[in-house]
């Protein structure tokens, strides 16, 4: 399997042989497991204060009073502490000691990563994610892109290679989030657009991340969630030549 290498003006400069990883079998089931496992490691443990609902001065009246034998407030007769009492503790609350992180076999995670990488070269899968682009996949650009330091210049390169329309799609579809998330630092729902994978960061990662929906990462830090946001593989991805060469050494 071969790919054309484009320069910063979108012109074909050479043709390279792609690593075997781009011919990997498509396994959406394993990709989903890997993404959910990665997401689970970001969950924070939560639970009530141990004293919630039980921090009362109470006594038990015992039998013979015609009342239920439950803890009662010392300054009155209303029930406290028990779950069925107003202001009492919860019956089975979430436990802060619960382990939220899901485990996955190393070989499965590796298989998922290889399958997600191969999906970026599948035009049908990429279009199913509503990405907009021109030309052939995968998009491989010369290593000159790694030293671009201005967002404006990155946008010009994306226009030249035919993927900037997807950035505009993400910008137009930004909207207010419904519900309580607006109060929790998640005011907008933003769409994912291009993923830029480079062999070495000489300034382009920070510049590219300023574009709507764009993620940029050094190839050694690549993970399944970046390649398949929301468990849906086939993200529109731009590779530099050095990143593709690194894949051949790393995963093949």
Swiss-Prot record:
GO terms for biological process: translation. The keyword ATP-binding does not apply. Keywords: Ribonucleoprotein, Ribosomal protein, RNA-binding, rRNA-binding. It comes from the Archaea. One of its GO terms (cellular component) is ribosome. PROSITE patterns: RIBOSOMAL_L1E. InterPro entries: Ribosomal_uL4 (IPR002136), Ribosomal_uL4_dom_sf (IPR023574), Ribosomal_uL4_euk/arc_CS (IPR013000), Ribosomal_uL4_euk/arch (IPR045240), Ribosomall_uL4-arc (IPR019970). GO terms for molecular function: rRNA binding; structural constituent of ribosome. Part of the 50S ribosomal subunit. Belongs to the universal ribosomal protein uL4 family. NCBIfam families: rpl4p_arch. One of the primary rRNA binding proteins, this protein initially binds near the 5'-end of the 23S rRNA. It is important during the early stages of 50S assembly. It makes multiple contacts with different domains of the 23S rRNA in the assembled 50S subunit and ribosome. This is Large ribosomal subunit protein uL4. It comes from Archaeoglobus fulgidus (strain ATCC 49558 / DSM 4304 / JCM 9628 / NBRC 100126 / VC-16).
């Amino acid at each position: 399997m071969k790919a054309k290498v484009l320069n910063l003006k979108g012109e074909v400069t050479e043709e390279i042989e792609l690593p075997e990883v781009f011919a990997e079998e498509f396994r959406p089931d394993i990709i989903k497991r890997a993404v959910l496992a990665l997401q689970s490691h970001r969950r924070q443990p939560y639970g009530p204060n141990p004293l919630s609902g039980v921090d009362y001065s109470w006594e038990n009246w015992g039998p013979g009073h015609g009342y239920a034998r439950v803890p009662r407030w010392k300054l009155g007769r209303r029930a406290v502490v028990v779950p069925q009492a107003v202001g009492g503790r919860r019956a089975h609350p979430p436990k802060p000691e619960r382990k939220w992180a899901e485990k996955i076999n190393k070989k499965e995670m590796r298989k998922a990563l290889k399958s997600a990488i191969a999906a970026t070269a599948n035009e049908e899968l990429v279009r199913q994610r509503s990405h907009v682009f021109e030309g052939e996949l995968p998009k491989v650009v010369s290593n000159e892109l790694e030293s671009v330091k201005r967002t404006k210049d990155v946008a010009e390169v994306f226009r030249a290679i035919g993927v900037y329309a997807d950035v505009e799609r993400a910008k137009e579809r930004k909207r207010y989030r419904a519900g309580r998330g607006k109060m929790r630092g998640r005011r907008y729902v933003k769409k994912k657009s291009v993923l830029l994978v480079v062999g070495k960061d000489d300034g382009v990662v920070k510049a590219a991340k300023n574009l709507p929906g764009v993620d940029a990462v050094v190839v050694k830090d690549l993970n399944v969630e970046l390649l398949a946001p929301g468990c849906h593989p086939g993200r529109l991805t731009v590779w530099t030549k050095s990143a593709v060469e690194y894949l051949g050494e790393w995963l093949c």
